[in-house]
């Protein structure tokens, strides 16, 4: 077991990606994947899985601030189920509330408005989702 995890920040146009190690509790962004109405290029996902060979995949679960589901919640669940169904890897959903806000803030601090491109924000959100998962002791 390599203790490598891959995280996705699901979106309808762009899906953020991060890779992390359970042993260090750290994650780093990978290039975001473009999506067509929430459907990714599955061959790109397959390549990521072959390259990184994660033990587990974490998919951010978008919830409202009060914990209730929103329209994107069901789509993120469907994305997670499809990954599990296609590739047979363990997939865990993890609360992603405020991850995009935190990602935008961090990127802006480091590079101003120029740093706020969509793919960077989505992958930075995936890093935050994965690090939050590690912080909760998983």
Curated annotation (Swiss-Prot):
Q: What is this protein called?
A: Putative pre-16S rRNA nuclease
* Record's subcellular location: Cytoplasm
User: PANTHER family recorded for this chain?
Assistant: POLYNUCLEOTIDYL TRANSFERASE, RIBONUCLEASE H-LIKE SUPERFAMILY PROTEIN
Q: Which organism is it from?
A: Salmonella dublin (strain CT_02021853)
User: Mainly resides where?
Assistant: cytoplasm
E.C. number(s) listed in UniProt: 3.1.-.-
Function recorded in the entry: Could be a nuclease involved in processing of the 5'-end of pre-16S rRNA.
Q: Which Gene3D superfamilies match?
A: YqgF/RNase H-like domain
One GO term in the molecular function aspect is: nuclease activity
- Keywords of this entry: Cytoplasm, Hydrolase, Nuclease, Ribosome biogenesis
Q: Which family does it belong to?
A: Belongs to the YqgF nuclease family.
Entry GO CC = cytosol
Residue ranges annotated as coiled coil are none
The organism's superkingdom is given as Bacteria
GO BP terms, alphabetized: rRNA 5'-end processing
Top EC group: hydrolase
